[in-house]
Amino acid sequence: MFIKVLGSAAGGGFPQWNCNCANCQGLRNGTIQASARTQSSIIVSDNGKEWVLCNASPDISQQIAHTPELNKPGVLRGTSIGGIILTDSQIDHTTGLLSLREGCPHQVWCTPEVHEDLSTGFPVFTMLRHWNGGLVHHPIAPQQPFTVDACPDLQFTAVPIASNAPPYSPYRDRPLPGHNVALFIEYRRNGQTLFYAPGLGEPDEALLPWLQKADCLLIDGTVWQDDELQAAGVGRNTGRDMGHLALSDEHGMMALLASLPAKRKILIHINNTNPILNELSPQRQALKQQGIEVSWDGMAITLQDTAC
C-alpha cells in the first residue's frame, strides 16, 4: 500500500494566514525551526498509479500541483484521483471539492450523515450538480467494508469515532455515529493495515480493537494541551470542544499511542499553535523519545510485509 500526505496541518494551515502566535510568527521570521504545512489530506493507492483521495482540503489545488503522482500523463485533461472518501463534513476536509469541479463527475464515498450536512448546511453536493454531474454519492455504513474501483486491492472500513459535527450541522454538539469516522484500510495482497483518524475526540472500547490491529497509525495530533488555544490567546475553545484529544493529557493521545503495538505511529492534523511544530521544542523531543513521528506535507509511506 502506498500512502502520501498531501497536507499535515489542521484547519487554517501553518502558518495560519491571520495568526501571529509564537509558532506562526516564528516561522515567518525564521526564529524557529519548522516547515509550512497545508490543511489535512492524504492519498492512498494499491499500485502507485491510481489513487484514492481521503478528504479534500481547501488547499487541494496547491497540494495537487506539488504531487506529480496525481498528474495523469497521456491525456489532455485528467487526474489519477480515482475516488474520494470523506471522513466527516468539516470545512477543512470538504471545501476542496469545489476546486475539483472541472473534473466532475467525481465518485465520493461518505456516510449518509456527512452527505446530509453537505447537501444542507454546506451544500457542496447541491452546488456541484451544475458541473457535469457533480458528485456521485456512494453511501458507506460504519464497520461495513467497501472498495473503490480505482484501487480494488484496498479494502476500506469506516469506524465511528467520538468527535463533533461542524457548526453548520443541525447535529452540532449532538453528533450521530456517522458524522465522524476513521478509516481502517487493508492492503489485501499482504494484509498490511493503516488506521487513519485526523480527528479523534475520545477513544472508546469499541475503537480499541481497530487501533490495536493496525500496522501503521496516522492519527490526530491537533493540540498538545487541551487549553492550548486559550493559553495562546487565539481562541476560547478547548481541544475537546473541537473534537480533538490533546497529546499531553494524562489520558491523552501520547498515552494511548504508548499502549498500542503499531510499527509506526504518525501524527497528522496539527494545529498552528501546537509546540511540536517547532522541531527543536521539548515537546517534539518528547515525541521522538516515544517513537512518535510528525507527518509533513509530501511524506510518503509504504506498507510492506515486514514493516511500514
From Swiss-Prot:
GO terms for biological process: pyrroloquinoline quinone biosynthetic process. Pathway: Cofactor biosynthesis; pyrroloquinoline quinone biosynthesis. Pfam families: Lactamase_B_2 (PF12706). May be involved in the transport of PQQ or its precursor to the periplasm. PANTHER family: COENZYME PQQ SYNTHESIS PROTEIN B, HYDROLASE C777.06C-RELATED-RELATED. Belongs to the PqqB family. This is Coenzyme PQQ synthesis protein B.
